[in-house]
């Protein structure tokens, strides 16, 4: 029986011109708002460095990744845009964050205190964006569960030494769904986020960078002031919006005869 090597069965081809088209379409929809290009997980398997360079050339203001290794890969490739790590960063890696000017997500008070202690130990400041959980149910200060406690926690983070709180963000759970319940849920998330932003601002800690929209959010609700929409503009053959997206990937198979 003749066997085929698994690694050669299929691959993805990326059309960088289509990627540019999609980014420009989202940028046009966002109006004057700058965009954060999400290139986590190797840009969803499509080449983080290659995609990030396209986004940078097209005017992205930020890049977002899932972990420190991904952020460092972009820095080593010569990308100088601000980078946000959406996931966890070990406190012991704070010196790298400071040295390479990488921003960490801050999603809980204990985590913030650990980052603060690590930064103070090396005599520096680490930049962080507060992560609000308005209904996604992942990491973040749980505004939907107990708004007052969550806001109090965020305010305490803002007062910690060694931290420079430069942003506030959240993630819409069902912005890509068109049912009445989903639209209502997305609106509730947006309202909670705006309340949190206002609470921080009124206490004297207005974040410089505010971002709550994902790709679906900015396409469906461009009228909502989101500050820095986060978008990933691959547009695969199976998942793309007729409003803007051109498929940027093509699957290729080599099949044995018969």
Predicted regions and their residues:
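Active-site loop/helix belt of alpha/beta enzymes
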Residues: 7, 41-49, 53-54, 58, ...
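Short secondary-structure boundary segments
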Residues: 67, 108-109, 132, 233
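Extended substrate/RNA-proximal surfaces in nucleic-acid metabolism proteins
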Residues: 104-105, 224
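A charged N-terminal "starter" segment
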Residues: 1-103, 109, 117, 164
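Conserved catalytic phosphorylation-site environment of P-type ATPases
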Residues: 112
């Amino acid at each position: 029986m003749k066997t085929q090597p698994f690694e050669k069965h299929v691959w993805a081809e990326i059309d960088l011109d289509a990627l540019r088209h999609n980014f420009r379409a989202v940028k046009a929809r966002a109006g004057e708002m700058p965009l954060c290009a999400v290139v986590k997980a190797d840009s969803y398997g499509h080449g983080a460095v290659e995609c990030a360079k396209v986004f940078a050339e097209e005017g992205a203001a930020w890049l977002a990744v899932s972990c420190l290794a991904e952020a460092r890969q972009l820095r080593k490739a010569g990308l100088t845009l601000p980078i946000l790590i959406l996931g966890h960063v070990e406190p012991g890696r704070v010196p790298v964050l400071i040295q390479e000017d990488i921003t960490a997500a801050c999603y809980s008070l204990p985590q913030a205190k650990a980052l603060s202690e690590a930064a103070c130990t090396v005599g520096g400041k680490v930049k962080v964006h507060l992560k609000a959980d308005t209904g996604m149910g992942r990491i973040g200060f749980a505004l939907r569960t107990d708004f007052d406690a969550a806001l109090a926690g965020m305010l305490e983070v803002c007062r910690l030494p060694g931290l420079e709180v430069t942003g506030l963000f959240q993630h819409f759970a069902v912005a890509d769904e068109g049912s009445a319940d989903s639209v209502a849920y997305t609106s509730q998330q947006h309202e909670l986020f705006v309340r949190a932003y206002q609470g921080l601002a009124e206490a004297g800690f207005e974040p410089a960078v505010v971002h709550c929209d994902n790709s679906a959010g900015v396409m469906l609700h461009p009228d909502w002031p989101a500050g820095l929409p986060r978008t990933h503009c691959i547009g695969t053959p199976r998942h793309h919006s007729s409003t803007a997206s051109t498929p940027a990937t093509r699957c290729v198979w080599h099949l044995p005869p018969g």
